[in-house]
């Protein structure tokens, strides 16, 4: 599928602000334009962006119900009540449980944690989990990354004498559960200044408020920011505002003095000694933590994150790595089977969304499969399987199509649903499958335009190769951490040429190792184009072509050079 390149064309106002900012901070015009496009237009804003400050974290008591939550927690600790820290089985949930449990452990000898089983209990608060709490004398449950829609289950817990403090970041319904406190910055009555916290981030704010109410030093809480960084990266929330501060300091902790559990994962990922980035969390650390909940039970991930000795951390990391290997095999198998179903669709070109179902598919990987189908076909995808008496599924979307809203418009056919704009989960009775499929496909057909089904690459700026040097890279690195709403900048260079030494590499010669030259400046630079072997014949013979790319540092044998990570090549027009 051919990519469409979208160039950001700066306005006259943006160019004026760029020039003013460049004069104030002494950075290159390109970097200053990138900052302006991200809403940073003054030297003071640039300073805060480049060097986030923990003092700029918002007052946690601005969040609705925070005072109630802290008061109830303090009472529970004072009365030595049994407290259960309850969280979802994904990375966000398990890191949130680990953070809250770690922080409260010194203040309670009756603290426990619980992760629901994906297959036996499903997502979120479960009756089984509440019964576990009741049977063990728990009188307060702190739920993390779940609970915002669990109205009936919270009522069930109240009947058993169990209070709930809900810490969630998903979209609430019009009616909130009748909990002691519902902490969610997305509440319609919220005046909290930042609504994009992860579930772990909400848990952190709760602990920040608890610490503040007791005049505890912030230093112990700061050590746990590594967990918020892992959750922010893995849950794909915007890395802006407060999340940028949390991610920035979390990465510092992860790189300088990680906990034993995360150190175990870092070692088994081959990241030891490397400067760990958001991308490393997204593609290496996060999937391994997630694999526990996908293949077995997410409690094992929490056990690892709470590990107290090196040997235990190493052993648990190896177990989780094994789960991840099994997950990869299963993921490939089910993706192949889903593609085979799609190949049988008579009118695939006309379809604006995909719904596939197989009762035998593994529930733990269907979210990954949905992502792969969306990437391949560039259409919203819903992947469904059978779980107990219900059909359950995961949905992923393309830019501009709110899949949560589409699924919400099918709510009368569903037993449960939840999620975000681009990712959601759902469950339904088998007799409603056909009606759901028809309605969802019609909603997509009515709303999605052809441009949304074309993969797009947003290009931040056009660069001459001569502009790419160590000074430029140093300025670019100051924009870390990159992620949603502060993506790693994508650049374009026009009319570059192969120096004559480019070659195919990889086990199946599927990648191109490039050596590029710019005739105008005689600048040479290396690049790698993964999976673009089909372009190799078009770029030979000093023919000019256009590339878009990100810039990386490549260290080999102690020598660091700059390298272009090529995202696309166009030989003719763009």
What are these regions (language model features)?
Residues 78-79, 312-316, 322-356, 409-574:
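Mid-to-C-terminal polyanion-binding domains and interfaces
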Residues 119-121, 150, 170-175, 189-190, ...:
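Short gly/pro/ser/thr-enriched loop/turn and capping motifs at secondary-structure boundaries
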Residues 150-151, 235:
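Intrinsically disordered, low-complexity regulatory tails of plant transcription factors
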Residues 2, 10-140, 160-161, 211-438, ...:
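Hydrophobic helix-and-loop "lid/oligomerization" segment in the mid-to-C-terminal part
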Residues 99, 177-216, 221-233:
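Short alpha-helices
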Residues 114, 144, 165-169, 183-185, ...:
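Generic beta-sheet signal
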Residues 75, 171-184, 516-521:
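Acidic-glycine-rich active-site phosphate/pyrophosphate-binding loop
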Residues 157-165:
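Hydrophobic or amphipathic alpha-helical targeting/insertion segments
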């Amino acid at each position: 599928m051919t990519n469409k390149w979208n160039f950001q064309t700066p306005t006259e106002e943006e160019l004026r602000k760029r020039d003013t900012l460049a004069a104030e901070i002494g950075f290159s015009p390109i970097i200053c334009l990138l900052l302006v496009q991200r809403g940073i237009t003054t030297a003071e804003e640039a300073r805060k962006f480049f060097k986030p400050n923990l003092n700029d974290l918002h007052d946690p008591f601005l969040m609705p119900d925070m005072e109630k939550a802290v008061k109830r927690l303090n009472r529970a600790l004072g009365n030595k009540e049994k407290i259960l820290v309850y969280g979802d089985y994904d990375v966000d949930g398990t890191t949130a449980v680990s953070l809250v449990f770690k922080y409260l452990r010194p203040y309670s000898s009756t603290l426990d944690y619980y992760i629901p089983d994906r297959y036996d209990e499903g997502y979120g608060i479960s009756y089984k989990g509440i019964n576990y709490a009741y049977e063990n004398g728990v009188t307060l449950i702190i739920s993390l990354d779940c609970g915002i829609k669990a109205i009936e289950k919270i009522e069930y817990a109240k009947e058993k004498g169990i209070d709930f403090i809900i810490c969630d970041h998903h979209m609430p319904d019009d009616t909130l559960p009748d909990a002691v406190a519902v902490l969610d910055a997305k509440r319609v009555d919220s005046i909290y200044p930042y609504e994009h916290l992860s579930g772990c981030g909400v848990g952190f704010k709760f602990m920040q408020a608890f610490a503040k109410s007791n005049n505890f030093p912030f230093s112990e809480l700061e050590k746990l920011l590594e967990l918020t960084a892992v959750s922010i990266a893995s849950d794909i929330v915007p890395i802006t505002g407060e999340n940028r501060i949390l991610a920035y300091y979390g990465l510092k902790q992860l790189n300088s003095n990680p906990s034993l559990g995360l150190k175990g994962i870092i070692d088994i990922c081959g990241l030891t000694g490397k400067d760990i980035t958001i991308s490393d969390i997204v593609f290496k650390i996060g999937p391994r933590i997630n694999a526990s909940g996908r293949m077995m039970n997410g409690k094992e991930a929490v056990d690892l994150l709470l590990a107290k000795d090196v040997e235990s951390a190493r052993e648990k990391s190896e177990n989780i790595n094994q789960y991840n290997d099994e997950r990869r095999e299963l993921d490939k198998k089910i993706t192949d089977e889903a593609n085979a179903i799609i190949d049988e669709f008579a009118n695939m070109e006309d379809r604006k969304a995909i719904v596939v179902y197989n009762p035998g598919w593994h529930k733990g990987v269907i979210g990954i499969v949905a992502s792969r189908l969306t990437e391949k076909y560039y259409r919203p995808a819903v992947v469904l399987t059978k779980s107990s008496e219900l059909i359950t599924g995961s949905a992923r979307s393309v830019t501009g199509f709110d899949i949560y809203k589409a699924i919400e418009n099918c709510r009368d056919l569903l037993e449960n649903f939840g999620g975000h704009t681009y990712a959601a989960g759902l469950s339904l009775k088998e007799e409603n499958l056909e009606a759901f499929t028809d309605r969802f496909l019609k909603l997509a057909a009515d709303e999605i335009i052809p441009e949304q089904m074309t993969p797009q690459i947003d290009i931040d700026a056009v660069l001459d190769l001569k502009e790419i040097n160590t000074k430029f890279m140093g300025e670019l690195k100051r924009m870390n951490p990159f992620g949603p709403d502060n993506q790693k900048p994508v650049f374009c260079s026009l009319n570059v040429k192969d120096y004559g030494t480019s070659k195919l590499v990889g086990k199946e010669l599927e990648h191109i190792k490039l050596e590029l030259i710019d005739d105008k400046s005689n600048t040479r630079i290396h690049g790698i184009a993964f999976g673009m072997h089909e372009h190799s014949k078009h770029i030979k013979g000093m023919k000019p072509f256009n590339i878009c790319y990100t810039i990386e540092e490549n260290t080999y044998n102690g020598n660091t050079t700059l390298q272009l990570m090529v995202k696309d090549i166009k030989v003719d027009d763009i």
